[in-house]
Regions:
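Hydrophobic helical h-region of N-terminal Sec-dependent signal peptides
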Residues: 6-14
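C-terminal motif of bacterial Sec signal peptides marking the signal peptidase cleavage site
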Residues: 16-19
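N-terminal (or domain-start) structured segment
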Residues: 21-111, 150, 175-198, 289-291, ...
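An extracytoplasmic/periplasmic, membrane-proximal ligand-sensing/linker region
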Residues: 29-31, 171-173, 177, 257-319
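Short, polar/charged alpha-helical segment
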Residues: 44-60, 163-171, 210, 276-277
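Hinge/capping helix and adjacent helix->loop/strand transition within the periplasmic-binding protein
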Residues: 82-88, 102-187, 236, 248-281
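A ligand-binding cleft/hinge motif common to bilobed small-molecule-binding domains
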Residues: 95-104, 168-172, 199-231, 309
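C-terminal lobe and pocket-closing loops
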Residues: 207-274, 303-306
Length: 319
């Protein structure tokens, strides 16, 4: 009897251990796909790849970034929303998730997702070619006023964050400019560096490489303070224009992902956000790390959606 009990106990122990092992390894069993709604080389792509490469060691599997571009981000946003809710496909959601519906570019809103974390925020700049005939924002405004409707400001898609940034600046400065849309910031920055357009209204992170190479100059940033890495760049407010504006970026899941899988993903990406290697990489990219947990991010999305609508109505950009 004693031997039978010992055998039964041993069997139960082994079964229980095996069961526990299986439970702890249910997710992830394979690599994860992270959808980026914007093109390679832009600020969204750069910060997403940085956080994913760090999160891999905490998640215990590979995270492959897949760029699905077009429609002011709506193609990528839809791909995230429509993904199978098994935790193996998620993606980065950005400001345009909240601006697209106001233009009729999407038939869904932030409510179609379960927000995981906020990753970063990024202020817009007004950037021009290095040898442009204006060296200050005031000189650029004077140039625009002397050439109404002829100055081209490049940004991302119509109604995108950088388009709105340019619109806010133009409205505040009282200038008439022509907005030139690109499918992401990278193309716009290349165009201004090559002298094909007069200016761009994109983030500092997105002009950094061209700025460091001496191909462009930043006239002002739409932030509350000067950038630490470039203290000579004035804020828009210092230049006489009360404009603070920029994008936000976070990670979203399709509705229906289980609480258990969400918890695993949340833990991995939260640890990644606090990882010194990620923080250093973000700093080198001139990206502002702005962490919000799922609950705080959800509230932020709601408030930002309503505020974005009000701003777009003010600029006449709503459908």
């Amino acid at each position: 009897m004693k031997k039978i009990l010992l055998a039964a106990t041993a069997a139960l122990f082994l079964f229980g251990a095996a069961g526990c092992k299986e439970k702890n390894n249910v997710y992830p069993k394979k690599g994860v796909t992270m959808i980026c709604p914007w093109g390679a080389g832009g600020g969204t792509d750069a910060i997403l790849r940085a956080v994913c490469s760090t999160a891999e060691k905490y998640l215990g599997t590979t995270i492959t970034v897949e760029n699905k571009t077009g429609g002011a981000g709506s193609i990528g946003f839809r791909a995230i929303k429509d993904a199978k809710p098994d935790g193996y496909t998620l993606g980065m959601i950005t400001f345009e998730l909240n601006s697209n519906p106001w233009q009729g570019l999407q038939d869904f809103t932030y409510e179609a997702y379960d927000p995981l974390i906020m990753v970063n925020t990024d202020a817009a700049t007004i950037t021009v070619k290095a040898d442009a005939p204006y060296n200050t924002l005031a000189e650029f405004v004077d140039y625009c006023k002397a050439h109404p409707g002829k100055v081209n400001i490049g940004n991302s898609a119509p109604g995108s964050v950088w388009h709105i940034a340019a619109g806010l600046f133009a409205s505040e400065a009282g200038i008439d400019v022509k907005h030139v849309p690109f499918e992401g910031a990278a193309g716009a920055v290349t165009a201004v560096a090559g002298g094909h357009i007069e200016a761009v209204s994109v983030s500092l992170a997105e002009v950094k490489s061209q700025l460091d190479a001496g191909n462009v100059k930043v006239l002002a940033i739409m932030d509350s303070k000067r950038p630490e890495a470039y203290p000579n760049i004035p804020t828009m407010k210092e230049c006489g224009y009360d404009v603070e504006f920029g994008t936000w970026r976070g990670i979203g899941l399709p509705k229906g992902v289980s609480a258990e899988i969400k918890a695993v993903l949340f833990d991995a990406f939260t640890k990644a956000m606090k990882d010194e290697n990620f923080i250093k990489t973000a700093k080198n990219l001139n990206q502002n790390v702005t962490y919000m947990d799922s609950e705080v991010f959800a509230t932020y999305l709601k408030n930002n959606y309503e505020g974005t609508g009000a701003t777009m109505k003010q600029l006449g950009l709503t459908n």
